[in-house]
């Protein structure tokens, strides 16, 4: 599956990365998680899991800032909020694709891991 967003052609196969989606209470609730797969599949990404993440609780359990480095906060980069009616539309993903492609190699290099990222949509 391929998609062109922000002038970049990509596919889940070419990126070869598992994408974990965490949904917090800002833009989408956990009950809305079923709208995410179609939204992201249309953008060429695979959704392996949808889960809620409470950052404060995770920090209280001893996660360091380095542990939280793979979190990419999308809301500042969306031109518009994404809801169920817009779930199939790739508008607003330009910033996400840019930041994702910029940060992921840096994260992989700094941690020695390979192509995984946890995305929190707030």
UniProtKB/Swiss-Prot annotation:
Residues 1-33 form the signal peptide. Keywords: Signal. Completely overlaps GIP3. This is Putative uncharacterized protein YPL136W. The lineage of its organism: Eukaryota, Fungi, Dikarya, Ascomycota, Saccharomycotina.
């Amino acid at each position: 599956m391929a998609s062109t967003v922000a002038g970049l052609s990509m596919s889940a196969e070419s990126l070869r990365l598992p994408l974990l989606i965490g949904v917090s209470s800002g833009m989408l609730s956990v009950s809305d998680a079923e709208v995410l797969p179609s939204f992201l599949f249309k953008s060429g990404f695979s959704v392996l899991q949808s889960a809620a993440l409470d950052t404060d609780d995770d920090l209280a359990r001893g996660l360091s800032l380095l542990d939280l480095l793979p979190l990419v906060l999308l809301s500042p980069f969306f031109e518009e909020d994404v809801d169920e009616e817009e779930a199939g539309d790739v508008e607003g993903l330009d910033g996400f694709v840019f930041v994702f492609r910029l940060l992921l190699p840096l994260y992989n290099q700094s941690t020695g891991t390979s192509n995984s990222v946890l995305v929190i949509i707030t």
